[in-house]
Amino acid sequence: MESFDIAIIGAGPIGLACGIEAKKAGLSHVIIDKGCLVNSIYNYPHNMTFFSTSDRLEIGNVPFISHNPKPTRPEALEYYRRVTSSWELNVRLYEKVNTVDIHSAKKTISTSKGSYEVDNIIIATGFYDLPFLLNVPGEDLPKVKHYYEEPHPYFGMKVAVVGAANSAVDVALETYRKGAKAVTMVVREPEISKKVKYWVKPDMDNRIKEGTVKAHFNSSITQINEHDITLATPEGEITIENDFVLAMTGYQPDFSFLKSCGIEIGNDEFKTPHYDEQTQETNVEGIFLAGVICGGLKTNKWFIENSRVHAEVIIDEIKGRS
């Protein structure tokens, strides 16, 4: 069994930042991820552009040079590959953490490929793995997608986009412009979210106003069939022809994993995990949280740019105890 000072669960940007700080402090580390490097970014839409400028995504004092005002997904993937190689981080990919044993002097992590004995654990798993489900009949049909990659498969198709935030708006506009036969938005709220990117929202509003993108507000899907969907709308129940449902309904952290590690989850509306905001340590001694997972269901609280500091805070705390 391999032994390390720190195990970092999650090889996203914040997990990598934690690994960098561990190396700088002379602490041995292993970064474990069930997917590929920066798996969430890899699963973003292929044509996605970040909100942040490239300098706000930098970690480890490695410059992030973008050829655009704001970096793209391919640029981010290239950047974090370069960071990982430059710092020679100890990354174990496609390795799922099965259990974490906290009931001994050293913590034991059992994975799909082996076991590790560690003094400290940093959980930086993000929130992109578990989509919020529609919980309606037919959601298990292949035509229903909770992740969107690119518009090409939807050319000539009748598409329903569920949601009203940035992802839903981007998907609706891109599929419309790349030749979808019909694009219909299904929105529970009375309007498109005011939090949609300021340079995109007017475009979406105008497409709805002119009718090139149809929108049903205060509405929800109640049934999904192979060739149509049923909606509950203020005017009553309607059925429309449909080839694909793109459910951009958001994602949530894996609370079951946190609980299996002994971490307490709050009773607040966001199910915020219990941790000390001064040290990032949870109620379990030696287990820390970093990145977006700290916000629980409030997934818009922490981003790469404002949670990079978690890495330094955690490693300083661990180093101060040794």
Question: Whereabouts are the PLM-identified features?
Answer:
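Short amphipathic alpha-helical segments
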Residues: 19-21, 42-43, 133-137, 172-174, ...
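Beta1-alpha1 glycine-rich phosphate/pyrophosphate-binding loop at the start
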Residues: 11-89, 169-199, 267
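Rossmann-like dinucleotide/flavin-binding elements
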Residues: 1-3, 8-34, 147-191, 278-322
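AMP-binding/adenylate-forming core of the ANL superfamily
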Residues: 121, 243-246, 287-288
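A Rossmann-like FAD-binding core segment of flavoenzymes
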Residues: 88-110, 115-116, 178-270
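Flavin (primarily FAD) binding-site architecture
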Residues: 123-139, 252-263
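Extreme N-terminal leader/targeting segments of oxidoreductases
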Residues: 1-6, 129-130, 136-144
